[in-house]
């Protein structure tokens, strides 16, 4: 594997704090660290988007339907719209895991499309799939329907599910499925450059 320098690596990292007990002081500190490290984005819960936006020059990402994915589609769309209004330029949406489990692919695709329509084309939309739960066939189908719905990226994990985070096999499968024009984001369980 080719070595990547620290500055290049930083640009693909979302400096993230999504714990429910995070405080405003924690968010301000996260933003200061993000500025110092020159990361690609600061990712916070929807209630902290405005504060983060006012405390860093780094792009802001926020989550919707987090962490379970079981929110109503209209709720996810409204949550995403509010986050964008508050300053987010990236949305990380958790797919409805029950629909993936039961193969309700049109529902998966329609929900992604609803969030895409709500936020517009200029906002980056990442769809989190919790790949540790699924067979290869389910991962492939979830990727295809997320992209058909308007996702800019597919993402491995919330990092909150008991199945763990990213796996190299899942990332490879996702990349092969979506091709070079759609992003693949490995998340969850990645703590070191070796990971």
Model regions and ranges:
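Alpha/beta enzyme core
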Residues: 2-37, 41-42, 47-184, 191-195
């Amino acid at each position: 594997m080719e070595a990547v320098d620290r500055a290049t690596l930083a640009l693909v990292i979302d400096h993230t704090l999504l714990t429910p007990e995070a405080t405003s002081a924690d968010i301000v500190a996260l933003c200061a660290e993000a500025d110092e490290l020159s990361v690609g984005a600061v990712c916070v819960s929807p209630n902290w988007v405005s504060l983060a936006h006012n405390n860093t020059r780094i792009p802001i990402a926020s989550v919707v339907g987090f962490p379970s994915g079981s929110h109503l589609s209209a709720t996810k769309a409204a949550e995403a719209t509010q986050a964008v209004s508050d300053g987010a330029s990236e949305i990380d949406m958790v797919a409805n895991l029950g629909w993936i489990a039961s193969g309700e692919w049109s529902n998966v695709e329609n929900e992604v499309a609803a969030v895409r329509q709500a936020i517009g084309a200029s906002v980056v939309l990442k769809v989190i799939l919790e790949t540790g739960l699924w067979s290869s066939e389910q991962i492939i189908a979830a990727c295809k329907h997320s992209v058909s719905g308007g996702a800019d990226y597919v993402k491995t994990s919330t990092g909150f599910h008991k199945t763990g985070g990213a796996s190299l096999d899942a990332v490879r499968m996702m990349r092969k499925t979506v091709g070079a024009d759609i992003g693949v984001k490995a998340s969850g369980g990645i703590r070191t450059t070796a990971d």
